[in-house]
Amino acid sequence: MIKLASLIKEAKSDYEVYHKSYTSAIEAARAYAEKKGYEINNDDAFTKIGMGPRKPSEGKTNRFDIELSKDGKVQRKKLQIQVYGMKNSYELNAYIQ
C-alpha cells in the first residue's frame, strides 16, 4: 500500500511560515527579499508597515506591497506580504511579483 505522505510533494518555502510575533514575521519577509537579491525601500516599508494598521487580530490579515530595487535601480516588482493573525501566532505569506 502506498503511503499518502509519499505522494504529496509540497513546495518548501524560502522562509519560516509560522511566527510567535508580528515583528518576527515582517523581518522574515524582509530577509526573504534580500536573499533573492533585492533591496527594500525603507521609506515605503516604514510608511506602509510601521505607520499602517496595527498587528492583525485573530482571524484577520494585513496585506502590504513594498517597493524593491536591485543594484540601485527601482524595480517594477514588489514584495507582497500577508500576515494572518492566529490565536497565539502569525502566519506569513510573502512573494515577489
Located regions from the model:
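Charge-dense, intrinsically disordered terminal/linker segments
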Residues: 1-97
